[in-house]
C-alpha cells in the first residue's frame, strides 16, 4: 500500500508516503508564495506580467490576422514586457519612484539574439513606448537607435523564462515575389506589427486600469450599413415624377453611375481603381455604394475616406451620418476635437468617438491626407496605433490630384503596398 511504502532517502533513513506527501504539500505552498511579477497596479488590484502579456498577445494576434500575420502578433505581444521581470522594475512598481527602469530593451535583445525572423520584432518591442527607432549602426553613438539600445546593459530579467514561452513564427513577413521593393515592404511590415503591438498594449492596459471605461466598438456591421444604404437610394431609383426632362436625364445618369459602381464593387477583386465622375454626378454616394459592396464581397473591415479639405470632409461626413447612422461614422481631422476628459456618462457617444480617434475602430472613417499618411510614416506610438486598422480596408482618396507633388512618390508607394499586402 502506498500509505506504508518505504523509500530510501538522503542520510540512509526511510520516509513513509505520508512524509513525502507532506513534503510535496510544503513545496506547493512555497510555489504559491513565490513572488508575483506585476505589470500594473491600480488601487488594490494587480495585473501580473503574464496576464498582461497574454492579453496583449491575443489582441495583437487578432489585429495582425487582418493581414495574415496573427502568429507575429501573438509573439510580439508575449515578449514586449519581459523586461518587467527585473527586480528593479518590481521595486519601482511597488512604489519606489526613484528607480528608473528601461523595460523595453530586454525583449528587443531576446529577439535580436534569437536572430532570423525574430530580429524584425526588435524594432517593435524596443519602441513600444519611446517610438519606433531607426536602425543605426553597430559602431554608432546614437543611443536612441535600435543598435544603440541593444548595446545598453539591462537588469537581469531571466525570470521571464519561468512564465513566458517564446512563440513560434510560422509565416514570412511578405512574399518577396510580390514586391519589387523588399526593403520598403519590410519597413511597412514592421510598422504594421508595431501598430498591432502598441494598440493591443494600450487596450489591455486600459481594460485593467479603467474598469468602467466606455466600451469600444458596438457599431453596426457593414451588412447592416449596406441595407441602410439600399433603403436610402431606393427613393432615387424608383423616382418617376420629374419637374423637367433635364432633371429626368440627370437623375437617370446619376442612377446609372451609382448602379455601375455598386455592380463593380461586388465583382472586382481587391486592387487600385479610379472613379471619374463630372461635378454633380453623385460621386460621393456612388463611391460609398462601391465601398460597401466591395468591403462585404472582399470580407474587409471598414471604409476610410481620405479627403484634402476639411470643408469637404464636413459635407461628406454629414451625408454618411444621415445614411449610415451617427455612431458608425468617425470624422477625424484638426478641426474636430473630441474631449476624453468630459463626463462620459453625460455623452457616451462623444466619448466613444474620442476613443475611436486613437485607433480608428469604426466602420467608416472620414479623414485628411495629413492624418492618413502621418500614420503610415510617423514613428510615435500615438500616431501609429490606427495603422493596423488600415489593413483589409477600402480606402478612397477623394480629389487625389490635389496631393502635393513632393509627397506624391512616398504616398503612392504606401498606397501600393497596402493594396499588395
Which residues does each PLM region occupy?
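Accessory nucleic-acid engagement/destabilization modules that flank
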Residues: 17, 24-27, 31-236
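Short basic/glycine-enriched coil/helix segment immediately N-terminal to the Walker B
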Residues: 70, 267, 358-362, 379-393
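Conserved Walker B
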Residues: 82, 362, 369-370, 399-403
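Conserved pre-motif I regulatory segment
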Residues: 240-276
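Walker A/P-loop
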Residues: 269-291
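Conserved Walker A/P-loop ATP-binding site and its immediately adjacent core
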Residues: 301-323, 336
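Inter-Walker segment of RecA-like/P-loop motor cores
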Residues: 326-377
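SF2 helicase catalytic motif II
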Residues: 383-411, 416-417
